[in-house]
Every structure is written in structure tokens, then in C-alpha cells.
Amino acid sequence: MPTCASHRSTTLRRSQWVASPLAALALQQTCLAAQAEPAAAELKLDQRRLAAIAGLPPAPGSAAEAADLAILEWLQRFRSPEIVATTWLLLDRDLDVFSSAVGTELGKATPMLSAGLHAFMEPVNSAYRGIKQQQGRIRPYVAYPGLVPCLPRENTGSFPSGHAVWFSSTAELLADLLPERRERLHYVGRQGGANRVLCGLHYPSDVEAGQRLGADAALQIIASPQWQAFRQDPALRAELELLRAVPAKALPPMLR
């Protein structure tokens, strides 16, 4: 099997394109992803535990669902253009959304961290998607057409919120690596889930379940030998040192 170095040499002979900085970066990210995948390989999460922590969605027509609906209706009534604009900033499940928490453009500055988190999140994604499919809760704007979301509509199930899972898990994993930025990372993690309610894409109970599931999944990952081995990777440690070098006074204010 060719190594990253041999692949780069072969590709350079085949095309002038790879001589560009963009191509070199793409190749570097591919190689780092290949490095990160073995670290997360064979990681098994306790699916039953995660399902129990997520719990069940409120039954249709129940008082709990009525409370969910009342919150969504109230938020829609007082939704401002500023709130809508802010929710769009955390639309994508991409590591860059945490850049403001650490004061560095994460996607460019930390390819090893990005690749590693992506690999470790795969079993988390698999777990919540299975629960979502099993529960089959329809989105609030489908059940109640008077609700008009301010972010793009989605056709997947509503419970639990996948965004809440991702933001919660990612915030916990980053906080384990960068405890100095824990509070700021957790703030972004909470806001990423809350935005799904603010814009009417999820019931509050969807997001609460996703946050519980995501936090516990992260704890399981952090306790695993795979994560501990990943933490010791020299490439990752070098990236974390760069992030720690950003002084606290240089960190941007967090959106409120």
C-alpha cells in the first residue's frame, strides 16, 4: 500500500495541479485523516446506555408536548432579525464554528485535530441516527404548520436533535483537550443546540435529549484507550500547543 509520501510523489508526476498550495493542503489533510482513523478504530459506544440517556420523546397530545409547542410559539412570536442572523452562524456541523472559542481558525490551523474529531464522531453519529429512526418523531413544523422555521427545513426525524448531539459531544471533546477554554467551548456547544429551538427546527425536548446523549457519548470516548492514544499523538500535541499560545486577552468576545 503506498504511503502518503509515495502518493504525493506519484501525483506530482501526473499533474501540475498538485504543485499548488491548495493541493498540498488537501493531500496533507488526507494523510492526517488516515493517521487519525486507526486511533478511533474499533471504538464501541454503549448504545443501550445512550438510548436510555436520550429517553423517549413526549407522546403526541401530551402535556409535555403542549409545553414544547408553547415554547416554540413564544419564540417565534418574538424572533428578531438579529436572532435569525445569529442562528445561521452555527448552522453547519463544522469544527470552524468553535474557532471563536479558541481564537484560531480551527479548520486551517489544526488538520490533525479536525481529522481525529471527525473519526471519533462516527460512532456517535451512528448511535443517534439509530435512535432518531426508531423514535420517528416528526418535526414540529410538520406537525404544526403554523410554525415557520428560520433555518433550512430538514426531512429527518426530530428526536433527538443531531445538531445538539454534535455540538455537545464536540464541545466536551475539545474541552478535554483544551481545559483552559472549557467555558467558552461549552457556551458554543450549548448555543449550537439552542439555535435549533430558536429557529423552530426542533422541539426543546429534542435538543435536551441530544445534549444528554452527546455529553455521555463524549464521556465514553474520553474514557476509551483510543482517545487516550490520540491525545498522545505528537502531531496533535503540536497543534494544541499552538492553540494554547493564543493569550486570553486576544480571544474575541462571544456572541450573546
Language-model segments: what does each one mean?
Residues 13-15, 28, 162, 205:
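Residue-level micro-sites within transmembrane alpha helices that shape
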Residues 191-222:
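Interfacial helix-loop-helix junctions of multi-pass membrane proteins
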Residues 1, 12-18:
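N-terminal export leaders
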Residues 36-198, 220, 231, 238, ...:
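Hydrophobic alpha-helical bundle signature of multipass membrane enzymes
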Residues 16-34:
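N-terminal export signals
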